[in-house]
Every structure is written in C-alpha cells, then in structure tokens.
Curated annotation (Swiss-Prot):
Protein name according to UniProt: S-adenosylmethionine:tRNA ribosyltransferase-isomerase
Reaction(s) catalysed by this chain's protein: 7-aminomethyl-7-carbaguanosine(34) in tRNA + S-adenosyl-L-methionine = epoxyqueuosine(34) in tRNA + adenine + L-methionine + 2 H(+)
Domain of life: Bacteria
Self-association and partners: Monomer.
GO molecular function, one term: S-adenosylmethionine:tRNA ribosyltransferase-isomerase activity
Designated gene of the protein: queA
Annotated metabolic or biological route of this protein: tRNA modification; tRNA-queuosine biosynthesis
Family the UniProt entry places it in: Belongs to the QueA family.
EC number: 2.4.99.17
Organism of provenance: Alcanivorax borkumensis (strain ATCC 700651 / DSM 11573 / NCIMB 13689 / SK2)
GO biological process, alphabetically ordered: queuosine biosynthetic process; tRNA wobble guanine modification
Length: 359
C-alpha cells in the first residue's frame, strides 16, 4: 500500500490557526453507514444513543516548549517529549549546533538543564531548579513554558491557547499535543450527553510530538510508529462490559482514545493497566473494540488519516475529505470535526479484564 494513496491537496486558507469563539462552534461532517451529512457539532447528539459509551482521553497538555540559550549564548528551543521524573526529561532540542553531553542550557527564572546524554533523536535533560515553589519539572514548565502548538498553526502561542488547546476534562498531565477531537466539548455538551443516557468514560494516552512527524517511507507497511504511554482504568473495563451487555456502542472521542483502547484489546477483551503502545492502524486492521469515532480532520499522508481509512474505508474517507474541502471546512487541531461509523462491527470478545499486568 502506497503512502501517496493518502495524499490530498488542502488550500492553506482552510488550516485553522485559531480556535472558534466557543468550543462547540464547529461544523460536523457525519459519515454514517449510508449517508454523508453536513451538520453543526452539537448535532453529534443525534448520532449517539442511550446506552452508548463515549470514551475520552483525559491527558493534560503541559506547557512543554521552552526558549533559552546555551552557555555560549546561542539560542536554543526545547520541546519536552516526556517528563521522566521531577528533574529529568526527554526532549527535542533545536539550536544552530547540537549541545554536547555535559553542557548546560539556561532558561528564565534561574532554571537550568544539563544535557546528560541522548536516546535516539531525543536529548536527556536533567533540570536544576531554584526552589521556592519551583521544585519539580512540572512546576517549572508551568512557570516558564509555552503551549506546544502544532507546527502547522505557524504562530507563537497566545494567552488564550493555554485554555483552548486543552480539553475541559483534562486531568492527567503529560501530553505535548492535545487530543483535539475533545476540544469541541464544553461542560454543557457533556451534561447533554449524560441527560440523553449516554455513558462517559476516560482513558489516558499522553500524546507525544511524534504525532506530527511525517511518514518518510513510500510503503505504508514500512512505517514504524512512535511510542506513547497509556492507562486503562479498571472502572472503564466495567463500563465497556456494561455497554456491551445492554447492546450499546463504544464511541472513541479522538484517535488517541481509539489507539489506547485498541492497544489494550490486542489479546482479546479490554485489559486494565498501563503501558506503552506503538500500535499502527492502517487499512486491513480488524478493530476489536471501537464502533464509532469522533475526530478532527487530519494531515495528508499522515498515520491518522490511514487510521480513519482503516476504520471507514479509504475511498469513503477520501471522498468525505473532498466534500469537506469543497464545503470549506476548517482543518486540523483547531478545526472542524467528523463523526464516523465504522464499516465493520468491532469484535465482541466479552472477556474484559479489570486488573492485570501492564501491557
């Protein structure tokens, strides 16, 4: 399968570089089994039914972008990929010359980081913190960090991004990119779902910067995915079992929630626990758990476009994207949304495991 099969031309004007005035002020392109409908995001309520289970990713975006300088005075930009502990992180570092092991990077407020090594393309940074309320890496990021907006937004972060590039239900800090399908939901929308009899559950998958990395091979099968941390709570396993028992569907809000659910279902049934996944979903994949998906519009030739093509069929997805471009939908993180029904029923292995070893 060729990566070029997932290419399309997108006018630059359709890239959303700012969020809408209100979270729910987005359009919704609904791709169901028998129709393609142009709607508004609150119309999602007409596509979910009492007894369905909507599963959200509750990861919280950290202000992971830092600007500083090397000991030589040269400028440096750091994007934290993963917080390892209170003082150590794995990070992407941009500078005119890569910093050497043992060298120091200096930031605002007396915060410094020593380069202690490399792990592949990532730098291992050990932070020296000034104390006085800034004694952990997360607290340092809250003090001097910037919102890690995606590269295609192509502007500096603004005060409003701290709120809007974050879901209203975010609670587990660790992501460096937002699970953007969830950005459309406000508290009123969540309440309306519950009033409709729709159950709501949460997974955690800490989205990494690798989600924006281009596919650099010609054949889809040759691509290797980046790894991300996830956690499936035992309470969610119970919710999934109950939804299946009453005939409800599992609806993933976002590709990150879907990847976590599918990763934790590879051995049959949903397994509680935490672990890492580099699951790569592309056409030919057999879905084990997810029946429907809420998602934003994705980049050409991206792994996420391949994922939704696996879910609903490449021809149907590419046709829907052509219709969206013709209708002037807004694309990517701050853009509009889709509701997609899968073309195949998810496997119904009911041997869900509430607790067990990490996967």
């Amino acid at each position: 399968m060729n990566v070029d099969d997932f290419d399309f031309e997108l006018p630059d004007r359709l890239i959303a570089r700012h969020p809408p005035a209100q979270r729910r002020d987005a359009r919704l392109l609904a791709l169901t089994c028998d129709a393609l409908e142009h709607q508004q995001f609150p119309d999602l309520l007409s596509h979910v039914h009492p007894g369905d289970l909507l599963i959200f990713n509750d990861t919280r975006v950290i202000p992971a972008r830092l600007f500083g300088q090397k000991e030589s005075g040269g400028k440096v930009e750091v994007l934290i990929e993963r917080v390892v502990d209170d003082h150590e992180a794995l990070a992407h570092v941009r500078a005119s010359k890569s910093p050497k092991p043992g060298s120091w990077l200096e930031f605002a407020k007396g915060i410094r980081a020593q380069v202690t090594g490399r792990r592949g393309a990532l730098f291992i940074l050990h932070f020296s913190l000034p104390g006085n309320g800034c004694d952990t890496l997360l607290s340092a990021l809250e003090l001097i960090g910037h919102v890690p907006l995606p590269p295609y937004i192509d502007r500096p972060d603004e005060d409003g991004d701290m709120e809007r590039y974050q879901t209203v239900y975010a609670r587990e800090p660790g992501a460096v990119a937002a699970p953007t399908a969830g950005l459309h939901f406000d508290d009123a929308m969540l309440a309306a779902l519950e009033q409709r009899g729709v159950d709501i559950g949460f997974v955690t998958l800490h989205v990494g910067a690798g989600t924006f990395q281009p596919v650099r091979v010609d054949k889809v099968e040759d691509h290797h995915m980046h790894s991300e941390r996830y956690q499936i709570p035992g309470s969610l396993v119970e919710q999934v079992a109950q939804a299946h028992a009453r005939g409800g569907r599992v609806v993933a809000v976002g590709t990150t929630a879907l990847r976590a659910l599918e990763a934790a279902s590879q051995s049959g049934g949903l397994h509680a626990g935490q672990g890492e996944t580099d699951i790569f979903i592309f056409p030919g994949y057999r879905f084990r758990l997810v029946d429907a998906l809420v998602t934003n519009f994705h980049l050409p030739k991206s792994t996420l476009l391949m994922l939704i093509s696996a879910f609903a069929g490449r021809d149907r997805i590419m046709g829907a994207y052509r219709a969206a471009i013709e209708a002037q939908y807004r694309f990517f993180s701050y853009g509009d949304a889709m509701f997609i029904e899968g073309t195949q029923p998810a496997s119904r292995n009911t041997q869900h495991v509430k607790s067990g070893a990490d996967e």
